[in-house]
Design a protein with these regions (language model features):
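Flexible, acidic/Gly-rich N-terminal and inter-domain linker regions that tether
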Residues: 1-32, 39, 378
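C-terminal scaffold of the Radical SAM
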Residues: 18-30, 48-358
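Local cysteine-cluster metal-coordination motifs and their immediate loop/turn environment
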Residues: 34-49
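An alpha-helix initiation/capping motif
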Residues: 249, 360-361, 390-393
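Short amphipathic alpha-helical interaction segments
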Residues: 360-374
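A short, conserved structural fragment
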Residues: 371-383
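Minor-groove-contacting beta-hairpin "wing" of winged helix-turn-helix DNA-binding domains
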Residues: 384-389
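Short, amphipathic alpha-helical interaction segments positioned at domain boundaries
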Residues: 391-405
Length: 405
């Protein structure tokens, strides 16, 4: 299970936004729709997801109708606040959204589009496990307005998939990608590196397999051991080795080199795309501080500097909405200093970087030291921007600390 919700102020039961919220209708608006169901809990995962035995009476078949109730609430709240505007991006995440019938995903998307509108050329992404994507599923999603499928490949090596508790076979990824392509969908694949027992050769095999798929976008994430997960307990008991930082660094450098050679450009520390048009616009909205409403249990939202998050369990979420109450559990409104620090954290991960002028004034002189250490690109700094080098990407957290402490 994921950890406790963040601290914050109580959220209004009717979901209303503060009257003094500085709404800017020019800021792009996105929607995140959380589908919290999984057949099996992966040993490394601490996301807010639930297997069938953990639902405590919540019914998967009722979920679409329940989430649409929150969409109706959001339409009223945003309309009252003068913040209603079309969605630039929509993202179905999880969990495993494709465990729901594709018709349910289509209903939720249609409800959101009816409530808020959908911008011309909007990006609509659905996350999927490879073994849940069939030609029929892909065609139904495409017909509903989905434009992009993000497929959880993670690895092409069977023993690595086993270490991660993934249920699909490597060959299922090709089947899923082909189904998505035949339906006219753009394709992104997710990889994880640094799993217990994974060698550099294993990782290279996964990169080769991912590149052979001819996808539009590849994400590669270092395995992080989260407290409370099965994998964390296995490491603590000495059953599996802890990931090696040095090996993970070697894996990242290999990924960057192989992806660049294949025509992919990095645009965020863990993300590469074949072209600017294939970047994840939804994730860029998060990193650039746009507005979004997160629907579903445990989902987080952000509008004009206000943040809130929903109750975590699907049963509690459904009970709140059945009582005509907002499912929000808490809210917070960070001050200007906190928002500046978060901006540094997020924008510094992007290839476009962050303007030196947007750093805390007392820390701007530190950029010279980061250049000398090979962490920040000197040419970008001349243009007034902080842009990470390859070494800087490997040590991104340390760079952020230097720029914000």
């Amino acid at each position: 299970m994921a950890g406790p919700l963040p601290l914050g102020d109580p959220a209004p039961t009717d979901g209303r936004l503060p009257d003094d919220l500085p709404i800017d209708p020019a800021v792009p608006f996105s929607a995140y729709l959380h589908v919290p169901f999984c057949r099996v809990r992966c040993g490394y995962c601490d996301f807010n997801t639930y297997t069938s035995s953990e639902l405590r009476g919540a019914k998967q078949e009722d979920y679409a109708s329940t989430l649409i109730t929150e969409i109706d609430l959001a339409e009223r709240v945003l309309s009252d606040a003068g913040a209603l505007r079309p969605m630039d991006t929509v993202f179905f995440g999880g969990g495993t959204p494709t465990l729901l019938p594709p018709g349910d995903l289509a209903r939720m998307l249609d409800a959101a589009a009816s409530a808020f509108g959908l911008s011309a050329g909007a990006e609509v992404t659905v996350e999927a496990n490879p073994d849940t994507v069939t030609p029929e599923v892909a065609r139904t999603l495409a017909a509903a307005g989905v434009t992009r499928l993000s497929i959880g490949m993670q690895s092409a090596v069977p023993h690595v998939l086993h270490a991660l508790d993934r249920t699909h076979r490597p060959e299922n990824v090709r089947t899923a990608v082909d189904a998505a392509r035949d339906a006219g969908l753009a394709v992104s694949v997710d990889l994880i590196y640094g799993a217990p027992g994974e060698s550099l050769a294993d990782w290279e095999a996964s990169l080769d397999a991912a590149l052979a798929l001819d996808s539009d976008h590849i994400s590669a994430y270092a395995l992080i051991i989260e407290d409370g997960t099965k994998l964390a307990r296995q490491i603590r008991r000495g059953e599996v080795p802890e990931p090696s930082d040095d090996l993970q660094a070697d894996m990242y450098e290999l990924a960057d080199a192989r992806l660049a050679a294949a025509g992919f450009d990095w645009y965020e520390v863990s993300n590469w795309a074949r072209s600017d048009d294939q970047r994840s616009r939804h994730n860029l909205a998060y990193w650039r501080g746009s507005d979004w409403w997160g629907f579903g249990p445990g989902a987080h939202s952000h509008v004009a500097g206000l943040r809130w998050w929903n109750v975590k369990h699907p049963a509690a979420y459904a009970q709140r909405l059945a009582a005509a109450e907002s499912p929000a559990a808490g809210t917070e409104r960070p001050d200007d200093d906190a928002r500046m620090l978060e901006q540094v954290l997020l924008l510094s991960r992007l290839a476009e970087g962050i303007a030196v002028a947007d750093l805390p004034p007392a820390n701007r002189a530190r950029v010279a030291g980061l250049i000398a250490d090979g962490l920040v690109d000197a040419a970008a700094a001349v243009r007034g921007r902080v842009r990470l080098t390859l070494r800087g990407r490997l040590l991104a957290d340390a760079v952020v600390r230097e720029l914000t402490d």
